[in-house]
Amino acid sequence: DPGAAIAVLKVPQGFPKAIDIEKVERLLNTPVGDGPYVLRDRAILETLYGAGLRVSELTALVVDDVDLEDSFLRVFGKGRKERVVPLGGHAKDALAAWMSGAGREVLLERRKRTDQAQRNVFLNKFGNPLSRKGTWAIVRRHGLRAGLGDDLTPHVLRHSCATHMLEAGASIRHVQELLGHSSIRSTQVYTGRREAELKAIYLEKHPRASAHLIEDTF
């Protein structure tokens, strides 16, 4: 019964979760307006997806790490390993708007007077450095607004960035460098996901997919 085989087709557990480009676009369009929180949230979402950052890397960004003129971020990953990440046009524009007088400066005026608060790129409503927990809450809130459920996380945006680049033809080495993986094995998991999805589609759609293939595990 071909229908029975189709019913059990799915990408195996353990691969990084990613969302498709249409859903990413819906998410990135949820912050509407020009208030400081809107500018901040838009910059967070665009930077997480556009640069493929870990949430800890995003919250650790300081003003000197952002080069809007040359469109680069200086990022410190695991073990304080430094890398330079390119900024796409949308992420650059969102960061520029947030770091203007209408965005970050408004929240900075509310800060408890610490040098670190003055340096951090992303701030909370009190003008203090935004925490990882706060970033997760922002991403989750906009995920709900975009109709993506309540389990959207910053890491899903990182995974989506890598997946979409590979699907567009980027080399695995370039994606490894972008994500800051010390081992290419960490990046190869994304190609495994693509292969699993291709196999699932093949088994569902190809009229000559054989019975023994349908029974195979991924």
Predicted feature descriptions by range:
Residues 1-218:
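Conserved catalytic core of the tyrosine transesterase superfamily
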